[in-house]
UniProtKB/Swiss-Prot annotation:
Substrate binds at residues 107, 139, 170, 249. It is found in: Cytoplasm; Mitochondrion inner membrane. It comes from the Eukaryota. The active site is at 194 (proton acceptor). It is an enzyme of class 1 (oxidoreductase). It comes from Rattus norvegicus. The lineage of its organism: Eukaryota, Metazoa, Chordata, Craniata, Vertebrata. NAD(+) binds at residues 30-58, 100, 139. This is L-lactate dehydrogenase B chain. GO terms for biological process: lactate metabolic process; NAD metabolic process; pyruvate metabolic process.
Length: 334
């Protein structure tokens, strides 16, 4: 007796299980992971979205909640499991998992605890998706991108840290607010280490090709009567402020990660400030990852833009590199 489905649908092609073309995996379904997931779904970037976490009930609940929104999305398959086989054939894997910093905990201790988590996660990702590109979002992102590169054995153009993509977006938003224009028309770059020691490249800030530093030569210095330097300070402080107010940050980083994925899956060759291996650049001698303007396309992170930096900016980059290396050199089991 034919089933209702058989009566309704007459097959034309053989029912072979198709390998997805644009599968994306998000590891970690906390606030950041789910913000990445919803941003990816909202931009219709994936034909399959996989979620992985160790908390099975939370994981299943998040999967079901997203699946129930399928009518309003263009992603036909949303799956989740604690077993990494669910991630097989991913084009891009976003890593948001990791342990949180405890009160009074040193960064080195936090990093070492996250290394121990990544030692389980990263080999599993590579086992099931050997051709993927990994985007690391977990903090401290520059060090954990290095850790991921070491543990994965992937070439450096396929291990990317979300880095200063969000810092630069915050910078452009805050400057654009002061000027009364849209952030996309206000160009400026935050480079280096994501977070406290990031570098604002004031010399490159422009609107419609007009250098703002030419209009105000003191811009970004302590002698600036308009105190533009405060904008960079606000960028650095903004995560702390949001965390103080709501407990975590998630929406902006989620949107920022989807932005990076779009450049890769659509082969756009757009330029983003993301964390990449900078050994040999700007006189940096160690294997550290810092944000520089990078071209992202279907092959991953294919090139780095040689930004003309001033001496003090280069000095700041090198200082960041030294700080990161001081922590990395003492990491165990890499």
């Amino acid at each position: 007796m034919a089933t209702l489905k058989e009566k309704l649908i007459a097959p034309v092609a053989d029912d072979e299980t198709a390998v997805p073309n644009n599968k994306i995996t998000v590891v970690g379904v906390g606030q950041v992971g789910m913000a990445c997931a919803i941003s990816i779904l909202g931009k219709s970037l994936a034909d399959e979205l996989a979620l992985v976490d160790v908390l099975e009930d939370k994981l299943k609940g998040e999967m079901m909640d997203l699946q129930h929104g399928s009518l309003f999305l263009q992603t036909p398959k949303i799956v989740a499991d604690k077993d990494y086989s669910v991630t097989a054939n991913s084009k891009i894997v976003v890593v948001t998992a990791g342990v949180r910093q405890q009160e009074g905990e040193s960064r080195l201790n936090l990093v070492q605890r996250n290394v121990n988590v990544f030692k389980f996660i990263i080999p599993q990702i590579v086992k099931y998706s050997p051709d993927c590109t990994i985007i690391v979002v977990s903090n401290p992102v520059d060090i954990l991108t290095y850790v991921t590169w070491k543990l994965s054995g992937l070439p450096k153009h396929r291990v990317i840290g979300s880095g200063c993509n969000l810092d630069s977006a915050r910078f452009r938003y805050l400057m654009a607010e002061k000027l009364g224009i849209h952030p996309s028309s206000c160009h400026g770059w935050i480079l280096g280490e994501h977070g406290d020691s990031s570098v604002a490249v004031w010399s490159g800030v422009n609107v419609a090709g007009v250098s703002l530093q030419e209009l105000n030569p003191e811009m970004g210095t302590d002698n600036d009567s308009e105190n533009w330097k405060e904008v960079h300070k606000m960028v650095v402080d903004s995560a702390y402020e949001v965390i103080k107010l709501k407990g975590y940050t998630n929406w902006a980083i989620g949107l920022s990660v989807a932005d990076l994925i779009e450049s890769m899956l659509k082969n756009l060759s757009r330029i983003h400030p993301v964390s990449t291996m900078v050994k040999g650049m700007y006189g940096i001698e160690n294997e550290v990852f810092l944000s520089l303007p990078c071209i992202l396309n279907a092959r991953g992170l294919t090139s780095v833009i040689n930004q003309k930096l001033k001496d003090d900016e280069v000095a700041q980059l090198r200082k960041s590199a030294d700080t990161l290396w001081d922590i990395q050199k003492d990491l165990k089991d890499l």
